[in-house]
Amino acid sequence: YMGLSIGIVGVRYNRSTNHTETTLDESLDLKELSYQEELTTTGGGVDIKVGILGRVTDRLRMGVSYHSPKWLQLDDTYYTRMTTTFRTPDSQGNFSYTGESPDGIFAYRVNTPWNVLASAAYVAGKNGLVSVDYGITDYRRMKLGGDNAIPDSYDFAYENGVIDQRFTRSQSVRVGTEWRSGNWYFRGGWGWWQDPYAGTDARHGSGY
């Protein structure tokens, strides 16, 4: 068996940050300072997934799949606002003053890492099965890029260099089994994931 899918990815992210400081000393004329930051990220992209599954014998099945990076085109829209409040008004009776930045717009591209997965399963008739999955993801393939429609846009060379230095190829192994005894079913699993940062591993134990 062989399968192919093309995915369409939509992105919308909103972040609102509010920071307020109030003076407790009433002898100070400045009463309160408030800072607000708004960020909206929108965009989309595509990805491709392809896989092959074969039955080696009546009991043994093997497969392999490839998940391409997500190729994303994103746009950030942001602005900031600051408000100061005083205890005594000015000559026009105003206690507060507010200043806003102009709206900022920044377009860029993001590529996520690809992933390859190989799997095998042994089916012991109606009694149970054992499955093994091996995956590999190269986090060094994450990339940032400027907007192709804008000449001389920022190329993210520094950021991509940091990704190459701090990330590495990550592997994972998962083993699962299920067995039947009468009306009872017993399940267990074990997994090992290599951290995308070099030098540390994360292990998840077994269960039933």
Give residue spans per PLM region.
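Outer-membrane beta-barrel porins/channels
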Residues: Y1-Y208
